[in-house]
Amino acid sequence: NQMRFQATITCKTSNIAVDIACNKEETKRMLELASIPVASGGICVDEEDLENVIKKIGYPIVIKPLDGNHGKGASINVKKWEDAVAGLAYAKNYSRRVIVEKFITGYDFRVLIIDNKLVAAAKREPAHVKGDGTHTIQQLIEETNKDPRRGYGHENVLTQIDVDRDTTDLLEKLGYTLETVPRKDEVVYLKSTANLSTGGTSVDVTDMMHPENIFLCERISRVIGLDICGVDIMAENLTQPLKENGGCILEVNAAPGFRMHLAPSEGLPRNVAAPVIDMLYPPGKPSRIPIIAV
């Protein structure tokens, strides 16, 4: 009855399913074959490929490494050729092949599926600060990082906000620098992706999901074959079916993080660890009391 797991990969997790989820091109192909909505786009290795894909789908676009994660190497809402070329070079620091997709407007949602059943859903927001009309962006970042919930890496429920190329690029597009003083109540986004690992926050929306979206996400976990599956969705909301509000699936993640569900910035915390134990040790199955190392 011994069961093993590391992070959110278990002894029941399929190696093939993990390989599929780590390959955005293969994931997208499988979802398209299953008539699941995904963003249009293509794969690039050089500027010629990039130009051809842009001619096909038009601006704005998203550029990201084919086998990347945690938003590393991604450029979002790219609207002109010079920025697209820079985004391609940036993504190629993380992967030889790059995926380019149509930029879809809406909010970033993460849906957690365990054992092919919905467990939790969260709306994610990129790292940001809110202006007070007095302090600079740098000072606001430092103040935000004093939140006791923020730590380094995954040591706490939220992550410190670091200033990197993504941050400076976003500020430059606004005509801002770290020394700019934002207007009172002005929200200044510091990252282009909503990952908690880059300082993002989350709001629980589990109880707001439309039944059709629940069915869709549970089906995705079966299509890819993951026992623990994080489905990333871009949509205006999850209260309507994606086919009605124009939403689509962005990615499917193996080893999805649990922090945003266990301790959301807003909303009801979800005990997402319990379904993992129930999957490994189903109720009623003859076994010893499970001993878990954390």
Show which residues each predicted segment covers.
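A generic structural-conservation signal
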Residues: 40-41, 63, 180, 230-232
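Oxyanion-binding "anion nests"
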Residues: 140-188
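Short, composition-biased local secondary-structure segments
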Residues: 1-5, 20, 183-192
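Active-site nucleotide/adenylate-binding loops and adjacent lid/helix of ATP-dependent enzymes
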Residues: 2-160, 211
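Generic detector of well-ordered alpha-helical segments enriched in charged/polar residues
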Residues: 51, 85, 89, 138-142, ...
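ATP-dependent carboxylate activation and anion-phosphoryl transfer catalytic cores
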Residues: 117, 125-132, 191-293
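Conserved small-residue-rich
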Residues: 22-23, 29, 287-294
